Amino acid sequence: MKNVYKLNAYQISQEDFRLNILYQANEDGVQTGYFREGIKNGVPLIQVFGLDRMDNQQNMYPDGVFDFIDNASSVGGTIEKNKGVIYFPFVEPFGKDLREILQDDELADKYCFDSLYTLTISQAQQYPDKNKFYLEGRYKSSSGSEISLKAMNIPQGSVKVMAGGIVLTEGVDY
């Protein structure tokens, strides 16, 4: 699915979470958070792509900030904070859905990466003229230092913990 993007972290905290979408312009090489032309001229890309629809009180007024709505896979939100995954509300956000949003074939041909949805990642990277959108942000992540064994009354010393094929010593290595 190419409307789902991993942050490579787990247990994402909403506190201090920031996400922005940037576009690398051809003309001057400057990354911008908005289009410079068309009906979406000046509109933040985070809003264009449906990741900012509400303010922080959940009123339907975009505020330029990512809408941190957890449990995306079950309630239609924007993030799965436990898995560290961002969900765009469109199936093909950088392809046909953006094409519909722009409502201009010439601009759509310029900005849309339609073939992204039929190519592998390595193939898509071969099109630098189309591969110009970037996700940028910051987050805090935490994960527990304990692993649940889902068992009770486990005798001391009966658990083997390994890292890289080497048995670790309880009380020394962990």
Residue ranges and their predicted role:
Residues 1-174:
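Surface-exposed, low-hydrophobicity segments enriched in Gly/Pro/acidic/Ser residues
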